[in-house]
């Protein structure tokens, strides 16, 4: 059986790990980095992922997608999406089903399609390390992701050619990474996870006893649209406002300028974690009739902290709720673990320290812990890791809409999963022959204030006065936190069951089409790689041939030289095109045309060999002379 890999599919960066000799190992990508920017760029010729995509973003802002995780499983009309529409350099659009999609070069794309490109790079990184094909993965998601977002993440895995064996919550994965080597005792750990686009807090009990370990999530809470990107956006808006005050021009109308501003803001934010002041200097950021304009703004750490103070405060309320749900006080928390790159900000660390009354641990890598935990969970599923039990929870309550537009809960938030629950309902009208089961997720009593996960009908109910028919609704949440619902007429035995798909979301047919598209892209990528290889070989041969022509000098007849130069010109012409086969043919023709050059080079080599042999014979008589070695010996005897 092949390896199951662990993937942290992050908003800003992604990471992949595997078990190697029983230990989780974070893998380096093709660029030699242990984390990969979650950035995907589309050009005329290829799809670029990671650091290379980031490097070209300034020249291709409309078709370079970042922070796509903030859109996954979301509706276009969601307030969180609308906040991003104006500030993103790429176009966010409403799909036919109401989902938030993106547009590149006139093509509409679902967020899972874009995320799949990142997953494919993670898959390839693991395959390069393992030397075998990888088809299975454990993928992490924010603990507070709802059902739609979890489904969309699984869809991304399928499109990337991966069977997602388990969806695991990011804070739980981080706790696994932290606690796997803690052999004895009972610890209650708070995992504060502030990543690029999402925030989670999980309270986890780690019980280690005689080699057996149980990781039990007691409570979780969070905000799926709060993270480092929001911190960046505050600084971006501040810089844009300062420039507008100074120059009277709004950079938000210029995608190219906004891409440069984003990169500069991210860099400045990182610098201000270790220094008190930095300067954002962007020459030629834009231009008007009077000429080019330059942006130069000094930013202090205090200024940045004032811009994001309310964002940091927003993370504290979920901490209070999670502690209350776990029925714990702050003093009962033994350890605090920080996960996610944004936790490197000193002000964030200060807020967490003040809240819990203790310093967070420094021995957990905030960028890699989640991927390490995913790899450990992969090991549990494959049987490589034994004596570890993981008990996760559902982050939000689940129920159905009942009479009066009320949400009736069947499963409360923070219930350990997998779990089942059932309840009997009846009809609202006399002789009602069908009921609509409207499935909801959230904590509000008013049905419309919660997230609609979908609905279906149970038909064929026998006519009867209202309140008499009995319809049993069963909710079943699997280990991925994904919901399956069934409704049964207890009198007739008629049953309707579905795996909940969001009221929007991707259909199986759409996912399958995207899988086929991805496979087609894989063929295109292979062709492009072959083209690049052919061009490189051709360029190398032309360079070497030119050098040999120069070295041959008069030994090369003029007609032979003309033949070789014509063949080189043909290669140069072929490399301008996109036909790898034509380049290879031209390259072969040049090799054949250069046969005379090879003869001249060999003749020269043999002549040099003869001269060297004569020189060796001349010096042979000296070979019998041995240099004497003298050592001075001091006589200590007196």
UniProtKB/Swiss-Prot annotation:
Matching HAMAP family: DnaK (MF_00332)
Protein name from the UniProt record: Chaperone protein DnaK
Source domain of life: Bacteria
Protein family: Belongs to the heat shock protein 70 family.
Sample GO molecular function, one term: unfolded protein binding
Compositional bias (Acidic residues): 624-638
Native species: Shewanella denitrificans (strain OS217 / ATCC BAA-1090 / DSM 15013)
Biological role: Acts as a chaperone.
Residues that bear Phosphothreonine: 198
UniProt cross-references to CDD domains, sorted A to Z: ASKHA_NBD_HSP70_DnaK-like
Keyword Zinc attached: no
Gene3D superfamilies: 1.20.1270.10, 3.30.420.40, Actin, Chain A, domain 4, Substrate Binding Domain Of DNAk, Chain A, domain 1
Entries under NCBIfam families matching the protein: PRK00290.1 (NF001413), PRK05183.1 (NF003520), prok_dnaK (TIGR02350)
Region (Disordered): 602-638
